[in-house]
Amino acid sequence: MATRGHVQDPNDRRLRPIYDYLDNGNNKMAIQQADKLLKKHKDLHCAKVLKAIGLQRTGKQEEAFTLAQEVAALEPTDDNSLQALTILYREMHRPELVTKLYEAAVKKVPNSEEYHSHLFMAYARVGEYKKMQQAGMALYKIVPKNPYYFWSVMSLIMQSISAQDENLSKTMFLPLAERMVEKMVKEDKIEAEAEVELYYMILERLGKYQEALDVIRGKLGEKLTSEIQSRENKCMAMYKKLSRWPECNALSRRLLLKNSDDWQFYLTYFDSVFRLIEEAWSPPAEGEHSLEGEVHYSAEKAVKFIEDRITEESKSSRHLRGPHLAKLELIRRLRSQGCNDEYKLGDPEELMFQYFKKFGDKPCCFTDLKVFVDLLPATQCTKFINQLLGVVPLSTPTEDKLALPADIRALQQHLCVVQLTRLLGLYHTMDKNQKLSVVRELMLRYQHGLEFGKTCLKTELQFSDYYCLLAVHALIDVWRETGDETTVWQALTLLEEGLTHSPSNAQFKLLLVRIYCMLGAFEPVVDLYSSLDAKHIQHDTIGYLLTRYAESLGQYAAASQSCNFALRFFHSNQKDTSEYIIQAYKYGAFEKIPEFIAFRNRLNNSLHFAQVRTERMLLDLLLEANISTSLAESIKSMNLRPEEDDIPWEDLRDNRDLNVFFSWDPKDRDVSEEHKKLSLEEETLWLRIRSLTLRLISGLPSLNHPVEPKNSEKTAENGVSSRIDILRLLLQQLEATLETGKRFIEKDIQYPFLGPVPTRMGGFFNSGCSQCQISSFYLVNDIYELDTSGLEDTMEIQERIENSFKSLLDQLKDVFSKCKGDLLEVKDGNLKTHPTLLENLVFFVETISVILWVSSYCESVLRPYKLNLQKKKKKKKETSIIMPPVFTSFQDYVTGLQTLISNVVDHIKGLETHLIALKLEELILEDTSLSPEERKFSKTVQGKVQSSYLHSLLEMGELLKKRLETTKKLKI
């Protein structure tokens, strides 16, 4: 609640205790206080609304809504009631009701600036742009203030952005907005910078670039003062749109003379120079070269200009990186034109060496040079690195001591050389022993570097952290190339050790998350991810690192929590962006409004959002359906309908940050655009499989309802096909998607370790669960046919069903065979993990659940038939009525399921016993090469993996026991 100031109105004084209780989260007391007040003052509407807020917050939504609607029906106009109702409706996620509230208030108090303003903002929350335009003008008529007028103009622009028909946007909304602003310009009523920005935005969207340029260069442009070079940047954008390269060149040259370290203007300068060369442009015989002054239209002039900037920089007391990097950029561009030798700019290797001498002690030196290493010939890389090492001030090496830096500057220089060594691929050409030798050296340098960071705060990174990261990357290379798991355990040990010295190092945490997950250990990952303290959009961009493994490693409670965490962000996005839009209107930041809308759409259409939503629903069904509630109840509570697909397939946005890991890999080993494209294809395919599976499951309970007669022409309401037709269509789609998925998996795509994470699709096919699940859905179709056709003359269908029962059991046994083996074993004194077995077990548990839901449907169809036959038998006292074998087959199948699930439960118990019996400490003690510190962290790492496996087995075992109980209830 908003805190109220000094209060005159006695009603405000009476309401004060309720506000206080609500502010402090004491909702029950707020309800009691409101009830007391309402006994004395029945007409105090605000007390009723505050009571409703208390009820809403204690989970009594329906009661709260009824109370709120009682007050809303009275169309209140007092500020307290309106504000309280606004808060309540927001908490109910019903912003559309706020608009009705203020529409009524405005009718009763037509000249209230405040209520008109609230009405406008209420429309903004629900995106009613047409009504916003009208509300803005109504407000301007009551109080002729410029901001209100321009609210209306902006609402027209929003109508143009949201219009489906682009032609309508260009011919109606934007021209009307332009005329409205021109009216203000003619009347000389433009007051604020925001109004000029809006005029510019309209002209730009209409493609009137020359008019927009005239506005910026004219008197109105003088109002653009809040951002540095705002006017120049807008002029530059228009020159580019108009392909006026002479002006682009002259303006960027002029801006570089002012600030020769502004990189964006170097790029524009080079772009324009080479465009002018391409067009063979020459200046006019008389007068200025261009509107913006002198133009450089040849490579010679560009070379001289850059050389002059470097000369000027050398005289300055402040070292600038821009001119030196611009020289390298110019060499690259001249080379691409095939004319480098003509202009003797120098050897890139020597230029980079000189750059390193000047800026090597700055952390940015590596990222600056990274862009230009492709200018180096491959044969010169080793020579270049040795040349750099030659100027790094290190101590004299001895037999047992490395050459070490004496201060932080020297450490930073050496670190830059090591990073460049990896980037140039020199580490990748080494064999296993050479790489392990490099790891030892890097870790010694890391330990030495910690001396310089003794005074660092916990929130600061150690100066030598990159040595540790580079060592881990080298160990991962060895692991990936040789399959030697010793190196991955060592990598985990180094990262855990690094984290104790740099608790805030996000790269350490991200790598730990990735490696633990790849080893199948989800337990340590939850806290690690949480400690990253991901903010806002990061839940979408890096959330995939957690949610990809959430369900697949058998820790259902943690998986559920992780999905909830991600979903909370996406659900609040809608509300949050509405507030940003309102603030943008209030403060006249009009150019930000389309950005906020685009941002909201990007999140609503997020691939990660769709994945988490689907997985969360499947997880909820797995944990609840037919355990705490029936499948039908679970599906109803989730509002699931098989005919509805709420995933925006055509507009899905991949917002994942696939470059979140620092990478020093050469270009041919790094994450490429092709990797990203393939990963998106794989993710979309897997999402489609999961979504179709969910929709098929959600259609099962609806088949239990009275069925339509055979050959019935009747269809369901609103022309929707009958329920079984929907399921058949979904089944066809699932089968087609599975075929596409199989073809994709056959490509055997290997992503870089630091790139996209493969989906669970490969495991789904390899475990045999895909075939199992699709077979069970085909069984549904056969059982439905039997249900509609009856037992007579359906021998063929019954035979199919009997075969399906046998086949399903065989397929499940096959899946179980792929789950056998120890998750953690000691081989030749080394620890070996088998995370695939864990993933297969998780798929088995999920598949068993799907099959039990299908079996439950089979039971609901077969039981009435059997009962009818038994009744007939009793009535006629005949023994000649033969029970069809389908009943016996079902009972045998259920018995088989029970036996199989019992066997899997026993197998899981066996795995637990084996894990507990493993003496990992003895293994660590046997390794004499480890220091006491390394032993400590090795013990931590191995203990975490062991504990996580046990946790996963425990949760899966518990869930399977519940499924076993469900199986025992399947009787006909």
Swiss-Prot record:
GO cellular component, as recorded: cytoplasm; cytosol; Golgi apparatus; NatB complex
Ranges of the TPR repeats in the UniProt entry: 11-44, 45-78, 79-112, 114-146
Keyword field contains Cytoplasm: yes
One of the Pfam families matching this protein, by short name: NatB_MDM20
Keyword check for Protein biosynthesis: no
Annotated localization: Cytoplasm
InterPro entries (alphabetical): NAA25_NatB_aux_su (IPR019183), TPR-like_helical_dom_sf (IPR011990)
Single GO BP term: cytoskeleton organization
Keywords noted in UniProt: Cytoplasm, Repeat, TPR repeat
Molecular function in Gene Ontology: acetyltransferase activator activity
Disulfide pairings: none
PROSITE patterns documented for this protein: TPR_REGION
Protein family according to the UniProt entry: Belongs to the MDM20/NAA25 family.
Role played: Non-catalytic subunit of the NatB complex which catalyzes acetylation of the N-terminal methionine residues of peptides beginning with Met-Asp, Met-Glu, Met-Asn and Met-Gln. May play a role in normal cell-cycle progression.
Protein name per its UniProtKB record: N-alpha-acetyltransferase 25, NatB auxiliary subunit
Gene source species: Homo sapiens (Human)
The encoding gene: NAA25
